[in-house]
Amino acid sequence: MQTTARLSVAEVFALLISVASMRAAGNLPFAGLADAGLAKIEKALPSDKVRDLRRFLDCLYVGKLAPQVDISDMGAMAPDLLPAFEMAFLQRLHLRFEYRDVKGVVTNRDVEPQAMLILPPLWYLVAWDPARNDFRHFRMDRISAPAYVEGETFHRRHVPFEDGVSSIRKLPR
């Protein structure tokens, strides 16, 4: 007996970014099977969910972490971060959260989420910060109490990335 699983866009996106991060790290032994399975999942989604998924994929970038980056303080991501990011990104709503910087100082942020950057093993929220009038990269394991803000929407901005960072759509399969 075969059953059909109902997956949300966030669940499919989580699968895709997991595969992408493993591919970027260079250790995905069954990449072909993973891609085939994900393609089947995408085909089973309703057209509005495929549109949401593609918009999500357009914001996903991967690269390699510089060897000198200290990851000794890396922690777990807040479980409510991805759902809050999904809603904020798809609906172009501000994302509000507490952010702990490298020195341990916690600040409240209200940003416009533009992209997600995976530099395995670290993940970053790339956002326009209206208070600073510039892009900011937030390590996702340092974000707590995330919530999208109902109301005013924002416009997408072109996010400049350095060489060595690629859109997930441009990664070799």
In which residue ranges do the predicted regions lie?
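Short, surface-exposed charged micro-motifs
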Residues: 114-115
